[in-house]
């Protein structure tokens, strides 16, 4: 079960992945998370993002933005970079990922996912058999951390158990 939380690959940034090699390996569709993967949370598309999506199209990739955000946020970003989109995707549920592949006319073996969150982005993509890249969040302060901590019983707990 835990293997579903491990990304296939990790990258410092979505912008630093070798997409040319991935295209040569047969990948044809890329699903991206937006916030903290491509831009800071809530930020509009940057010139860097717009140029980046243009280069991906030149390589031959289909691109799609998959977000749990509402349509105005996702549509405005998608329009700016020239990508397809699915809003209120319900990540980590499978439906959004499956719809994304359907829209791009790709299968799990020709699609990859790029995102910054283990418990939504990576888990959802892995449940669909999609190769995953986990990126470092653009703004680590905004990253949602889920930590499993071991805490020893407090002295009070020890007294009550006697």
Please tell me what each predicted stretch does.
Residues 150-157:
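Conserved small/polar residues in nucleotide/adenosyl-binding loops
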Residues 114, 119-147:
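Acidic, Mg2+-coordinating phosphoryl-transfer loop and its flanking beta/alpha structural elements
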Residues 1-32:
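Non-catalytic pre-domain segments flanking phosphatase-related domains
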Residues 30-32, 37-44, 49-78:
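Substrate-recognition element of Asp-dependent hydrolases with the DxDx(T/V) motif
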Residues 80-82, 128:
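Short, structured coil segments at secondary-structure junctions
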Residues 88-94, 137-140:
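Short, acidic/turn-prone active-site loops that include or flank metal/cofactor-
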Residues 94-118:
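Conserved Lys-Pro-Asp/Glu-containing loop-to-beta segment of HAD-superfamily phosphomonoesterases
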């Amino acid at each position: 079960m835990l293997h579903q939380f491990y990304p296939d690959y990790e990258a410092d940034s979505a912008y630093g992945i070798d997409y040319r090699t991935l295209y040569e390996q047969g990948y044809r569709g890329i699903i991206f998370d937006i916030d903290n993967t491509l831009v800071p949370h809530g930020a509009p598309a940057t010139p860097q993002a717009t140029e980046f999506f243009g280069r991906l199209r030149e390589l031959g990739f289909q691109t799609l933005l998959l977000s749990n955000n509402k349509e105005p946020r996702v549509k405005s970003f998608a329009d700016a970079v020239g990508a397809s989109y699915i809003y209120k995707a319900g990540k980590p549920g499978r439906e959004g990922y499956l719809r994304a592949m359907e829209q791009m006319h790709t299968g799990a073996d020709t699609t990859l996912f790029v995102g910054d969150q283990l418990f939504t982005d990576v888990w959802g993509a892995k449940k669909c058999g999609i190769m995953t890249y986990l990126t470092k969040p653009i703004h680590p302060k905004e990253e949602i951390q889920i930590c499993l901590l071991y805490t020893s019983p407090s002295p009070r707990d020890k007294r009550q158990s006697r």
